[in-house]
Each structure stands twice: as structure tokens, then as C-alpha cells.
Amino acid sequence: IVYVLAQVAGCILGAWLAHAMFELPILQASTHVRAGPAQMLSEGVATFALLFAILFVSRWKAEAVPPAVALVITAGYWWTASTSFANPAISIARAMSDTFAGVRPADVPGFIAGQIAGALLAWAASVALLPKDRQT
């Protein structure tokens, strides 16, 4: 639970820092509507892609995980309707940013539901498809 709280706090502080860098009010609440099945599906797909990439790449070359994460998140920005948050902590923090990147607080539970579904599917796919031991 400490790890989860640290992630949420770090994401919120990051949003506030971004506001300060762009001379925006530090404390905001998003009004950017991101509701509906397409957004939830997009977050599920983005989270699946991110976690499966981590699990896949780490089986062969652990040091390649950071660039793989960067590539999946960058690509997900372009190929998902939600712009690929892929992390509940980010979804919570983006509810505190009334910018294009923001998400209305009422829409956050749908994002998190999609992310949980994507995470569970990525885990199941990794168990079914990937070797159990690290490959060299």
C-alpha cells in the first residue's frame, strides 16, 4: 500500500510541477470529458500492451525494459483513444489537471477499471504464452 500511495503522490506532484512550469494554477480539477466504453477499452489495451511488453522483454533482456516501456507509452499515445495513461496513479493525477491531458474526476473509475482488466489479461497472457524462466 505504501508503494501505491507513493506512486499516486508522485504523479500528483508531477502534475503540479508541470502546472508551475507552464505558469498555470497549481491546483485544478479537470473538466475534460473522457467517458464511455471506448475510453475504458483504450485503457485496457494500453495497459495490456505496457505490462505484456514488460513481462515479455524482461524474460530475455531485462536492461531493455526501460526503452520498451518508453516505446509502448509513446506508441500508445497515438493508437489509443485515451492517449494511454496505463496506470491508475496517472489517471488520478490527471484528474487534477484541467488541460488536454486531463480527465474529469467522474471518469477516473472507468479508466482504472480498464487498466485493471488490461493488467489481468496481460498477466494471463504472459502465463499462457511466455516461458517460465528468464531466457538468455
Task: Specify the residue positions occupied by each region the protein language model found.
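Membrane-interface helix-loop junctions and terminal tails of multi-pass membrane proteins
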Residues: 1-136
